[in-house]
């Protein structure tokens, strides 16, 4: 079975300076892969590079044997969702609105949601036990609730790959 996601001799870093070199990963569909290391070791930098948020220094990232840099943003968003540790700060959006942004790769130019999109949004909220906060402003919920909403947004994309950077950070103990 060929890997769904691969990196080949990937070098990552900032301002053209490679901090980590020769990263080679092969991730099979349906598998969970973790990057473990101390703070500051480059795990987030590797993840940001894999998903295209940070330019690579050298090497290749392949998704379904296609080079990531040849895929459109829409194609990438249909294949891959990401939840990073950086917090988003949407103004005037409810939690449902934030989750619904996960459907944008599947909508038309105006981003209007169809009935199926609305069903997927609700199902994603329910999967993370966040239905009761769906209509609350995103800015008015706890960090743990925000993390659940961001996880719901990733699920709402219905991607083949979900990249999570410290996914349990901010989660409330009682949930």
Question: Model regions: which residues?
Answer:
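The feature captures the beta-strand-to-loop junction immediately N-terminal to the Walker
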Residues: 36-38
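Helix-to-loop junction immediately C-terminal to a conserved catalytic motif
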Residues: 51
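Conserved ABC transporter NBD signature motif
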Residues: 59-67, 76
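Conserved ABC ATPase "signature" region
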Residues: 100, 115-133, 158
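Conserved ABC ATPase signature
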Residues: 111-112, 137-141, 145
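Hydrophobic anchor residue at the start of the ABC signature
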Residues: 151
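Catalytic Walker B motif of ABC-type/P-loop ATPase nucleotide-binding domains
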Residues: 162-166
